[in-house]
From Swiss-Prot:
<dbReference type="InterPro" id="IPR050499">
    <property type="entry name" value="PEP-utilizing_PTS_enzyme"/>
</dbReference>
<feature type="active site" description="Pros-phosphohistidine intermediate; for HPr activity">
    <location>
        <position position="15"/>
    </location>
</feature>
<feature type="active site" description="Tele-phosphohistidine intermediate; for PTS EI activity">
    <location>
        <position position="298"/>
    </location>
</feature>
<feature type="domain" description="HPr">
    <location>
        <begin position="1"/>
        <end position="90"/>
    </location>
</feature>
<feature type="modified residue" description="Phosphohistidine; by autocatalysis">
    <location>
        <position position="298"/>
    </location>
</feature>
<feature type="binding site">
    <location>
        <position position="540"/>
    </location>
    <ligand>
        <name>Mg(2+)</name>
    </ligand>
</feature>
<feature type="modified residue" description="Phosphohistidine; by HPr">
    <location>
        <position position="747"/>
    </location>
</feature>
<protein>
    <recommendedName>
        <fullName>Multiphosphoryl transfer protein</fullName>
        <ecNumber>2.7.3.9</ecNumber>
        <ecNumber>2.7.1.202</ecNumber>
    </recommendedName>
</protein>
<comment type="function">
    <text>Multifunctional protein that includes general (non sugar-specific) and sugar-specific components of the phosphoenolpyruvate-dependent sugar phosphotransferase system (sugar PTS). This major carbohydrate active transport system catalyzes the phosphorylation of incoming sugar substrates concomitantly with their translocation across the cell membrane. The enzyme II FryABC PTS system is involved in fructose transport.</text>
</comment>
<dbReference type="InterPro" id="IPR000121">
    <property type="entry name" value="PEP_util_C"/>
</dbReference>
<dbReference type="InterPro" id="IPR008279">
    <property type="entry name" value="PEP-util_enz_mobile_dom"/>
</dbReference>
<feature type="modified residue" description="Phosphohistidine; by EI">
    <location>
        <position position="15"/>
    </location>
</feature>
<feature type="binding site">
    <location>
        <position position="574"/>
    </location>
    <ligand>
        <name>phosphoenolpyruvate</name>
    </ligand>
</feature>
<feature type="active site" description="Proton donor; for EI activity">
    <location>
        <position position="611"/>
    </location>
</feature>
<dbReference type="Pfam" id="PF00381">
    <property type="entry name" value="PTS-HPr"/>
</dbReference>
<dbReference type="InterPro" id="IPR016152">
    <property type="entry name" value="PTrfase/Anion_transptr"/>
</dbReference>
<dbReference type="InterPro" id="IPR036618">
    <property type="entry name" value="PtsI_HPr-bd_sf"/>
</dbReference>
Length: 831
């Protein structure tokens, strides 16, 4: 018997999706494989999803896989790589607490006296629709169905039918929906799930309906006893597949909650299963109020992926009397506004306008090329493993793909992919990319990524073993097939080739020879292909660093694999808990090595990127920029934040930071240096076109202040528009800011404003400013930083003096557009 020991790396524990993936990995082996949770002293058949879920395994639990059988050595090698490298990817990223924390109710809403119910935010957003109550169905009618001689046959038929339905949905869905449906399919195909129903029928003589319900209750009870909220919330998945089985077996007992949404609807229910959610017309699902759903339920994951706002914490009996009435579900402030009046509806119309502006701006920002504040260009690209990931990466702002892990095509299968399959996969991502560069890393297999059909013997230390470019000469036909596929696909886009684990010039010279042979073959075969291809290497073996100058004669670029390079530089196995604390790329030796690579390559006209985890670490972005790296490749969700941060950094300041870091004596000194490093704030003018509006159709004072404060949030002048608005209203409480002549000057000094601003809205029609000075047609809002000293008084005084001048006022009211107002103010005012 062989054993793999590990700590559970899953932040949410071993729930349905990772259990399904682990079961799939284990089921391909003939050996018996037992999963053990040592904290719980719980054992499970690793080829049963349900049994795995039942172990109650939480993050960082001590676990092991015991493997016994004819193929145990191969199984251990492959499963160890999966557990240590890929298992964590089977878990889902959950929203942060900040994302689920309701904003304080803005004064521009509370002053309108809305009829509100308060709840808890589960999925952020705002939805407008009719409140519709979904009643829960009792299962008593199924439980009461007497046992029948046909029950066993009916069970098999129902299981097969449900599996067929789930498979059909899998073919039609993608993203989170597909992942959750796969987990459900795994559960109903699980021997333990069906086996327990059969045992209840044979040993306890229960009818099929009662047995399905009893099995559901037993599994749910076990999950409900878990210490993990995430595992407790998997109860909904068990209930879901059990209820689907009941409905398939007795279709005549049609559930009352078969809901069709014919207009925008806010759905109110005790809970909603994933299959119920997927059956809804999402175009008309404005939001949901779910009394008992937890923050990590699969229904919530689907809702977030579909941008459906959700609240909880509202008792159904408190909402039932409002059924059929219009409402606004505000899952930003955590409230339900019942039967909103015109003023409240107007507030949410303004909120939607601001949300649309923000979404448009974010899309534009993501599409922009990445530059530092002083216009230093750096490519921000994505790491992906399949062509399906490419569109999402580009939507996040990826300027290309810095690492396409082609080895994913070779894994978890019985034979290697043929040339056509590879060509189609590579072509797909290139077509999605347009002219964006795609760097295909040739197959990084062998060693820690064992491929059974290659029959590479097990090694003591696979990370230092027979892998990547080292295996290519033995498997030259396999490598040539991949080269042909990439060269064919390269004729459809900007393809580049990268070779992993290179340590000598001989290896790259051999590879270049194989590329030429592949080109000759493709010409002979009459297949469309690229005549040349940009070639680079992964820099992950330290020996390469000392002969970068020689490699510059043979390749076009370098990409530093920081994960493996760190291991090899320090002789540290990052998966060994006794030495993993030594694994740290932010040390003087590592940074000096990066500096040497970049300097030497740049001197010879070659570019250098980084594609390990370090590339997406925002804390270390100033160092990477300062070291002169030309490209950062990372997981695509990190790209928007990295691009945004880069725009705040001055490359010269970062270069000095990197120089100082390379002179440090320890990692601790470098971390202290980073902590003390404060990027210089981008200076923005007090007056800017982005904050000036003409002919704004506001109904009241509240909308004007809401819009102007919210717009400052959209434009990045404040990260806290609600808090800034509160400061404006506090000033309004002291004395109204209507100054006469149809003008109001709301103002504040606030800690919440990053860039002091003057915002202007000329209104389409006057509004009541609740001031003795009459209605207002022009709003000039001053929001100045808390550290501005007496500057706010100077600005206010200048404006007030100018506004007394009739000609100045008339010019403001007569200006044709926002640019004309900006030009007038810049001419007349000095700050």
């Amino acid at each position: 018997m062989l054993t793999i020991q590990f700590l559970c790396p899953l932040p949410n524990g071993l729930h349905a999706r990772p259990a399904w993936e682990l079961k799939e990995q284990c089921s391909q082996w003939q050996s018996e494989i037992t999963f053990i949770n040592h904290r719980q002293n719980a054992k499970a058949d690793a080829k049963s999803s349900l049994a795995l879920i039942g172990t109650g395994t939480l993050f960082n639990d001590s676990c092991s896989l015991n493997i016994s059988g004819s193929d145990e050595e191969q199984a251990r090698r492959v499963l160890e790589e999966y557990i240590l490298v890929r298992f964590i990817d089977s878990d889902s990223v959950q929203p942060t607490q900040a994302e689920l924390t309701a904003h304080p109710l803005p004064r521009s809403l509370s002053r309108l006296n809305p009829d509100l119910l308060y709840g808890n935010v589960l999925a952020s957003g705002v939805g407008v629709g009719t409140l519709t109550l979904l009643q829960s169905d009792s299962l008593d009618s199924y439980r009461a169905i007497p046992a029948s001689a046909q029950d066993s046959t009916r069970l098999e038929h129902s299981l097969a039918t449900l599996a067929e339905q789930l498979n059909q949905q899998l073919r039609e869905r993608d993203g989170e929906s597909k992942t959750i449906l796969s987990a459900h399919l795994s559960l109903i195909q699980d021997d333990e799930f069906a086996g327990n129903i059969r045992r209840l029928m044979t040993e306890q003589h229960q009818g099929l309906g009662a047995a399905i319900i009893s099995n559901m209750e037993q599994v749910c009870a076990k999950l409900s006893a878990s210490a993990s909220d995430y595992l407790r919330e998997r109860v909904s998945d068990i209930r879901d597949i059990s209820e689907q089985l009941l409905h398939i077996t007795w279709p005549e007992l049609k559930p009352r909650n078969n809901l069709v949404l014919e207009k925008p609807t806010i759905l109110v229910a005790e809970d909603l299963t994933p299959s119920q959610f997927l059956s809804l017309d999402l175009k008309n699902l404005a939001g949901m109020i779910l009394e008992k759903t937890g923050r990590t339920s699969h229904t919530l994951i689907l809702a977030r992926a579909s941008a459906i706002p959700v609240l909880s914490g509202l008792p159904l009996d408190a909402i039932a009397r409002y059924a059929g009435q219009p409402a606004v579900l505000d899952a930003q402030c955590g409230v339900l506004a019942i039967n909103p009046n015109d003023a409240v509806s107007g507030y949410y119309q303004v909120a939607q306008t601001l949300a649309d502006k923000r979404q448009k701006q974010q899309a534009q920002a993501a599409a922009q090329l990445a530059y530092s504040r002083d216009n230093k260009r750096i490519d921000i690209v994505a790491n992906i493993g399949t062509a399906l990931e490419a569109p999402g990466a580009f939507a996040n702002g990826a300027e290309g793909v810095g690492l396409f892990r082609t080895e994913m095509l070779y894994m978890d299968r019985d034979s290697a992919p043929d040339e056509q399959e590879q060509f189609e996969a590579y072509q797909q991502v290139l077509l999605a990319a347009g002219d964006k560069p795609i760097i295909f890393r040739t197959m990084d297999i062998g060693g820690d990524k064992s491929i059974p059909y290659l029959n590479i013997p097990q090694e003591e230390n696979p990370f230092l073993g027979y892998r990547a470019v080292r295996i290519y000469p033995e498997f030259a036909g396999l490598f040539r097939t991949q080269l042909r596929a990439i060269l064919r696909a390269a004729s459809f886009g900007n393809a580049q080739l990268m070779i992993p684990m290179v340590h000598s010039l001989d290896q790259i010279l051999w590879v270049k020879g194989e590329i030429q042979k592949a080109i000759v073959e493709l010409k002979r075969d009459g297949l469309r292909h690229a005549e040349t291809i940009t070639l680079g290497i992964m820099v992950e073996v330290p020996s390469v660093c000392y002969i970068i100058d020689h490699f510059c004669d043979e390749v076009d670029f370098f990409s530093i694999g920081s994960n493996d390079m760190t291991q090899y530089l320090y002789a540290v196995d990052r998966n060994n808990p006794r030495v993993s604390p030594l694994y740290n790329p932010i040390t003087p030796s590592f940074l000096r090595m990066l500096q040497q690579i970049v300097t030497t390559a740049h001197q010879r006209g070659k570019w250098v990127g980084i594609c390990g985890e370090l590339g997406g670490e925002s804390r270390y972005l100033p160092l990477l920029l300062g070291l002169g790296l030309d490209e950062l490749s990372m997981s695509s969700p990190r790209i928007p934040a990295v691009k945004s941060q880069l725009r705040q950094l001055d490359s010269e300041a970062c270069r000095e930071l990197a120089r100082q870091a390379c002179e440090c004596r320890s990692a601790q000194e470098i971390e202290a240096l980073l902590t003390a490093f404060t990027p210089e704030e981008d200076v923005r003018p007090l007056l800017a076109l982005e904050n000036i509006f003409v002919d704004q159709d506001f109904s009241n004072k509240e909308q004007a202040i809401q819009f102007l404060c919210g717009n400052l949030g959209v434009n990045g002048r404040t990260e806290h528009p609600f808090e800034l608005e509160e400061d404006v209203w506090q000033r309004e409480e002291i004395v109204t800011t209507g100054v006469g002549f149809g003008v109001a000057i709301p103002h504040t000094k606030s800690q919440w404003i990053r860039h002091s601003s003057i915002s202007i809205a000329r209104l389409a029609k006057p509004v009541d400013w609740q001031s003795e000075m009459g209605e207002v047609e022009l709003v000039i809002m001053l929001t100045l930083g808390a550290n501005e000293g007496m500057n706010h008084v100077k600005v206010f005084s200048q404006l007030a003096r100018k506004l007394v001048n009739k000609n100045f006022r008339q010019s403001l009211f007569a200006a044709q557009d926002a640019q004309s107002i900006l030009t007038l103010l810049e001419t007349e005012l000095t700050f």
